[in-house]
Amino acid sequence: TVTGILLGMQQLLQNIKNGKTIVEDVPVPTPREGQALVKVSASLVSAGTERMVVEFAEKSYLGKARSRPDLVKQTLDKAKREGVMPTVQAVFNRLDQPMALGYSTAGTIVALGKNMQGFKVGQRVACAGSGYATHAEYNVVPRNLLTPLPKNVDFESAAFTTLGAIALHGFRLAEPQLGENVAIIG
């Protein structure tokens, strides 16, 4: 740091084009309105989700297309609207952008953007969201993807918050009835 300003950090990134996973030195993000900068203390590795991303990145272009027909359809629709060459360029630009891995972390707020009532610097929080709660030293997270931690919850346990929320959402969608047996797997 220089006069309290954070200059750089490390972040785990996945190269979607060639499949390589790397730890990269990147700038510390700055929180905007409605966001907090969180110093990460624990980051959860989701074996299923992150394995899927890594396996996707390691596939050939044809393999990527076969595994994501939804994206192929979006690409064809874009080509019809905007033309083939701009679409091809957009696809290669997207593949050249490294993807931040992770979506469930816990840490301490070190800076706040405007309109972050209910949160304060020094507050311990759980963070959620792909592209927000990544495997990095610091994350900028919007207020709707933050939740304060009770004093008796440690960072390692809090890093499971997102997975618990996903399981709870799935449980609610299933609408189980009183007396039914259910199993939550994954």
Give the location of each predicted region.
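Residue-level recognition of short, solvent-exposed, well-ordered loop/turn junctions
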Residues: 32, 120-121, 142, 177
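Conserved hydrophobic helix-helix packing surfaces used for dimerization/oligomerization
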Residues: 11, 181-182
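A glycine-/small-residue-rich N-terminal strand-loop-strand element
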Residues: 86-97, 104-130
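Short N-terminal strand-loop motif that marks the start
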Residues: 4-97
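Short, Lys/Arg- and Gly-enriched loop/turn segments at beta-strand edges
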Residues: 50, 133-140
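A glycine-rich, Thr/Ser-enriched phosphate-binding loop motif common to dinucleotide/cofactor-binding enzymes
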Residues: 101-103, 128, 135, 145, ...
